[in-house]
C-alpha cells in the first residue's frame, strides 16, 4: 500500500487522516468473547482446523469445506489474481488465499484489534491487512480480480449498495464471491430478525442486533449472479450436517 495514503500501525495499513471508530468493534468483540470466538495466535494460525471439543467445531467444519471449495475454484483459473476479502476478521481466510500461487491478497476490516492480530500472525509477502470501510473509497478505486465476502455480508445494511461498490473495485472479468452467510426467503426473514434480537438480548448485548442485517436471497438476483452452491434446507442442515449457506458468484452485467 502506498505510503502517501497509508500509515502502518502494528502491521496494519490505516488510511491517513482516518481515526479508527471503535463503537462497532467493542460490541463485536464482546459478542465474540461470549460466543468463544476470540482465538489465540496459536489457534488462528491453524484455522479452519480446530479442536474437536471446541464449542465452534461444527461451524469451522463448515467453513473448512467452503474454504476448500473456493480455493479449488480459484486455483483452476491458473492466473495471477488480485484478491480482496471484505470483512476479513482475524485474517485466517486471507492467509489461506495468499497460499494460492500468483496471488496478491488484501484483507480489509473495521476491527482493528483482529486486524493487528492477523498482521502479527500472518506475515506472507503477498498479504496485507488494511483498516477501513470500503464505502469510504479508502482503496482509491483499486481494481481486484476477486472480491470475497466470507461471513461478512450480513454486517452491511444494504446489499445493493455494497455489491455496487464492490463492482466498482472489480476488474472487467472479475468476480465477487459471497460465502458463509445466511440469505433468506421472504417468508422466513421476519422470524430470523426476531430470533436475532432475542439472541443478543439474552446475551446481554441487545445493541448488537442493530449491526446485524438479514438479507434476501432474491435481492442478489438483481445482479449478474450465479449460484455456485444452493443453500441447504433446515432439514438437511440438521440431520445431514450439510452447509446451510449458499455460495454466490456475481460478475459485471453482460
Predicted region positions:
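A short, conserved alpha-helix within the catalytic core of class I
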Residues: 156-166
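Conserved alpha-helix/loop element of class I SAM-dependent methyltransferases that forms part
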Residues: 59-79
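Class I SAM-dependent methyltransferase SAM/SAH-binding core
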Residues: 92-136
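Short alpha-helix
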Residues: 208-226
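Conserved beta-strand signature within the Rossmann-like core of class I S-adenosyl-L-methionine
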Residues: 174-182
Amino acid at each position: 500500500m502506498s505510503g502517501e495514503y497509508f500509515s502502518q500501525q502494528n502491521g496494519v495499513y490505516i488510511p491517513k487522516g482516518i481515526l479508527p471508530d471503535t463503537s462497532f468493534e467493542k460490541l463485536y468483540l464482546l459478542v465474540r468473547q461470549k460466543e468463544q470466538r476470540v482465538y489465540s495466535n496459536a489457534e488462528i494460525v491453524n484455522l479452519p482446523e480446530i479442536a474437536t471439543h471446541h464449542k465452534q467445531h461444527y461451524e469451522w467444519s463448515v467453513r473448512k469445506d467452503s474454504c476448500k471449495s473456493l480455493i479449488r475454484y480459484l486455483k483452476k483459473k491458473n492466473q495471477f489474481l488480485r484478491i480482496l476479502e471484505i470483512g476479513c476478521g482475524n485474517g485466517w481466510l486471507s492467509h489461506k488465499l495468499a497460499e494460492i500461487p500468483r496471488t496478491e491478497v488484501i484483507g480489509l476490516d473495521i476491527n482493528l484489534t483482529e486486524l493487528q492480530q492477523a498482521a502479527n500472525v500472518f506475515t506472507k509477502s503477498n498479504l496485507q491487512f488494511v483498516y477501513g470501510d470500503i464505502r469510504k473509497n479508502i482503496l482509491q478505486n483499486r481494481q481486484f480480480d476477486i472480491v470475497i465476502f466470507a461471513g461478512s455480508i450480513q454486517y452491511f445494511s444494504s446489499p445493493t449498495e455494497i455489491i455496487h461498490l464492490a463492482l466498482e473495485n472489480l476488474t472487467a472479468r472479475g468476480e465477487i464471491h459471497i460465502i458463509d452467510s445466511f440469505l433468506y426467503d421472504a417468508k422466513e426473514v421476519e422470524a430470523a430478525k426476531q430470533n436475532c434480537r432475542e439472541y443478543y438480548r439474552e446475551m446481554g448485548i441487545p445493541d448488537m442486533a442493530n449491526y446485524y442485517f438479514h438479507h434476501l436471497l432474491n435481492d442478489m438476483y438483481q445482479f449478474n449472479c450465479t449460484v455456485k452452491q444452493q443453500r441447504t434446507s433446515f432439514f438437511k442442515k440438521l440431520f445431514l450436517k450439510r452447509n446451510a449457506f449458499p455460495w454466490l458468484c456475481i460478475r459485471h452485467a453482460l
